[in-house]
Curated annotation (Swiss-Prot):
MF terms (GO), sorted A to Z: DNA binding
Keyword vocabulary terms for this entry: DNA-binding, Nucleus, Repeat
Protein's cellular compartments: Nucleus
InterPro entries hit by this protein: DEK_C (IPR014876), HMG_box_dom (IPR009071), HMG_box_dom_sf (IPR036910), HMGB (IPR050342)
Main location: nucleus
Residue ranges occupied by any DEK-C domain in the UniProt entry: 8-63
Name of the protein: High mobility group protein homolog TDP-1
Length: 271
């Protein structure tokens, strides 16, 4: 019997959780429905009333370089698939094709975590995947990685409350282990790092201002929740180009107000 979901305010770590889920599922495959199911599974609460807020978080997250690259690659592969009649694997490269080389900026921009930095905590979903992946591959030797991940995602969605609770407890234990190790690392003079090797920012810092296009994308997403993020971004981009000056002005004013809000909150921070 499924547990009845409670109602309540957004969790304080919701933005971090949304970004984690987007990383785990991938921009190519995640949809509003998958995101909502994952959030409801983690927090055991309804997220329907918070749809607009979640859309805003996704819009901001899509401005991150890691997700922009995923989106750009997915759109290129989708266009290439269409131009070639959709034949062959979307992920396949031609035999002579080489991966694009990184620029000096890309190679030097991000500071690397020290080798002795504590191993990051793993989410309940990834712990489940780690336990089930090899068994699934053994039973389906010819299954592609994409299909394996999609199957594992469905297995997780269909898993019983007891199974999910088991992995949630394991994830909480791992999170506590990571927190202890990071605290000890900091006591010894080290700095705390976030994902991607960047030094962790202040969690109390104001949220960055949204652009006019981000506000439009959030509005567009709320009306087309059946689309994947890749399809959504492409459709929103096309729709944005079709907007007239008066229609854009609405979103530009929203962006200007948010920019002023960000400036005020930054100015109010203790020096």
């Amino acid at each position: 019997m499924a547990t009845e979901l409670k109602k309540g305010p957004l969790p304080t770590d919701i933005e971090e959780t949304v970004i984690t889920i987007m990383r785990e599922e991938g921009v190519r495959y995640i949809t509003a429905k998958i995101l909502r199911m994952r959030l409801e599974s983690k927090y055991q609460m309804e997220f329907g009333p918070h749809k607009a807020a979640i859309d805003d978080i996704v819009a901001r997250a899509m401005q991150r370089p890691e997700f922009k690259k995923q989106l750009e690659l997915a759109l290129k592969e989708k266009d290439a698939s269409k131009s070639s009649g959709g034949k062959g694997s979307k992920r396949a490269r031609s035999a002579g094709a080489e991966a694009p080389s990184k620029t000096k900026k890309e190679m030097t921009e991000k500071p690397k975590k020290p080798a002795d930095y504590p191993k990051p905590a793993v989410s309940s979903y990834l712990l489940f995947v780690a336990d089930q992946r090899e068994e699934l591959k053994a039973k389906n030797p010819g299954m592609q990685n994409t299909a394996i991940l999609q199957t594992l995602g469905k297995m997780w969605s269909d898993a019983s409350d007891d199974v999910k609770e088991h992995y949630r407890k394991k994830a909480e234990e791992d999170k506590a282990r990571f927190r202890r190790e990071v605290d000890e690392y900091k006591r010894q003079g080290g700095k705390e790092y976030g994902r991607g090797g960047k030094i962790k920012k202040d969690s109390n810092a104001p949220k960055r201002a949204m652009t006019s296009f981000m506000f439009f994308s959030s509005d567009f997403r709320s009306k087309h929740s059946d689309l994947s993020i890749v399809e959504m971004s492409k459709a929103a981009g096309a729709a944005w180009k079709e907007l007239g000056p008066e229609e854009r002005k609405v979103y530009e004013e929203m962006a200007e107000k948010d920019k002023e809000r960000y400036k005020r909150e930054m100015a109010a921070l203790p020096k």
